[in-house]
Regions:
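Alpha-helical transmembrane bundles and membrane-interface segments of multipass inner-membrane proteins
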Residues: 1-257
Length: 257
């Protein structure tokens, strides 16, 4: 079992990382214009651009909210168990496990609280995501996300004459559509960090690769904590399982003999 100082390192990193992740997401989504152009922080190196991601790390496995929540809960249990089995002198490993816990909790919080409705448009059955804008009694005003010029707005309300059948009125235009149930809710993760690096246009690089983004994903602090923590953990596991060199045991015996 780890020493109390080890627990302190683990908890401080986990709580501090989680607080930084949630605060940075709150700041970005209240300061930056959603759906707008990126804010350049360091040209060609760092930009801020808000985006809702329905997948896991870097958008993998989009739309599986329930599966991600269950997997995240299991991962949290595994991380705490691994920490409890870690020797007290593995300080860097304590920090890495705390970072993994912070990242998992940060994205898990978003998936459980940041929800959009998944709704097919009447014309062409095109699937869009709509966010609740306001509520008045049983009626909900929904607007297409992300915000853009010409975004579709809906009014969702129950049909009093047909029980739990819902009516969606598209605004403007008054196009109506009946639904047997509410649109499906999907959990999202808030991302806002972008590294806008591209392949340079050097002569020896193939033409089709020049100008392509090296890092097309938008991510958040939780993603960075997860990647850093898992990287350190992988290095530790690899070092612990490396086979001993043939002469190392004999040398050790000679020194102790």
């Amino acid at each position: 079992m780890s020493h109390w100082a080890s627990w302190m390192r683990f908890v401080v990193v986990a709580v501090g990382g989680l607080a930084l992740d949630l605060w940075s997401k709150q700041w970005a989504f209240h300061t930056l214009r959603q759906g707008g152009p990126p804010r350049v922080v360091i040209p060609h190196v760092l930009e801020f651009q808000t985006m809702l991601n329905k997948g896991a790390l870097f958008g993998i496995g989009a739309g599986q909210t329930g599966l991600f929540l269950v997997a995240s809960a299991l991962a949290l249990v595994l991380v705490v168990w691994m920490f409890s089995q870690t020797p007290r002198h593995r300080r860097l490993l304590h920090v890495a496990l705390g970072a993994i816990l912070a990242g998992a909790l940060g994205n898990m919080f978003d998936r459980a609280t940041v929800k959009l409705y998944e709704h097919p448009l009447p014309a062409g059955n095109r699937l869009v995501y709509v966010a609740p804008v306001s509520r008045e009694g049983a009626e909900v005003l929904l607007r297409e996300y992300p915000p853009r010029d010409g975004a579709v707005t809906f009014r969702l309300y129950p049909d009093p004459g047909r029980g739990d059948v819902y009516v969606v009125q598209r605004l403007p235009g008054g196009i109506r559509r009946r639904l047997k149930a509410l649109p499906r809710e999907v959990g999202f993760v808030r991302d806002f960090i972008k590294i806008p690096t591209t392949v340079p246009a050097w002569s020896w690089i193939p033409q089709k690769l020049r100008g392509r983004e090296l890092w097309p994903w938008v991510f958040n602090v939780a993603d960075a904590l997860l990647v850093a923590g898992v990287g350190v953990l992988a290095i530790h596991l690899w070092r612990d399982r490396r086979p001993e060199r043939p002469g190392s045991a004999a040398v050790g015996d000679a020194k102790t003999g």
